[in-house]
Structures are given as structure tokens and as C-alpha cells.
Amino acid sequence: GKNATVLHYSDNNSKTEDGDLILFDVGAQYEYYNGDISRTFPVNGKFTDRQKTIYNIVLEGQKIVIDKAKAGIEFKSLNCILKDYYAKALSKIGLISNAEEVNKYYYHGVSHLLGLETHDVGRHNEGLLKSGMVMTVEPGLYIAEEGIGIRIEDNILIENNGCRVLSKDIIKTVEDIEDFMKW
């Protein structure tokens, strides 16, 4: 519901309603190294048409960024790539009328480094990606006036010719989520 539009809603005291979305932001640790995954699921098991449209925009944005992520790419360019895509996609569905309005619905970066801290230290938003870096790709859209908050976050390992999605086995398509919710 509306709390999915809050980046890190920690009160955890609201009742979910039929038609709401739940945004899960989940961390895990293995031998002191951290993972950080987000998924968004419909409470009732089915996305509305509008939720599905927004969800698929976020998912496509994530795919675009993952396809561009590789050693030698400027870190901050990934956020620019996503915002350019969002400007076109959100304009196409009538949510915005100019590119500057993207910031109303997308107000965080597309990535952060992972390591001994979930948001690992360093000047990661400057410079080039290097082979061996582990980071998130976490586009989101937060439409408070519609109660829609969607983030899809995966962890990737930067390689010379691309990246490896470390969290690839966690479901994230609309179809897979709705099938999972049937059980």
C-alpha cells in the first residue's frame, strides 16, 4: 500500500488491504558479506492492470541497467541510463510530461556497492566499474498518489564483458509472482 512508497518503512504497523502491494527489502549475510534484495508482491496474489504496467516499467529498467553494467562503465552513468528510460516510459503512460518529473517518482540511486556492509563504503558513485565489484541494481518507482511503490533489486558481480546476476533464481516477473502467490 502507501507505505511501499516510503524507501525504508520501518514502523511495520499498518494493515495490508486487498489490492495493496508489499515491498520486501531483504538482507542476508554469508561469512560477513551482505546481500540486499527487493521484490514487490500483490497482497491478494494478482497485480491490477496499473500495478502491472508500473511493475513492468521497473523490470524493464532493471534489465536495461543490468545489460549495460560491466567493467569500464562509469558508475553514475547507470543511473542516467535508467532515468532516461523512465522519462520515456512514464511519459508514454501519461504519468509525466517532461524528463525532470521523473524525480517525483524515482528518488534514489539505481545501485550501491555490497560487501562487509549492506551499503558498502567508498566513493562508489565516482569512477569506473571494475571487475570483481559486487553491487545492487535496484530501480524503483513510487507513486504516492496511487499507493503504488515498486522496487526490484538484485545483486550483480561486475565482470570484464558484462555482469553476473547473483540473485537470478529469485522470481521477479509478473507471471512468476502471480503463479507463486496461488499456492
Region roles according to the model:
Residues G1-W183:
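Active-site neighborhoods and metal-handling regions in enzymes and metal-associated proteins
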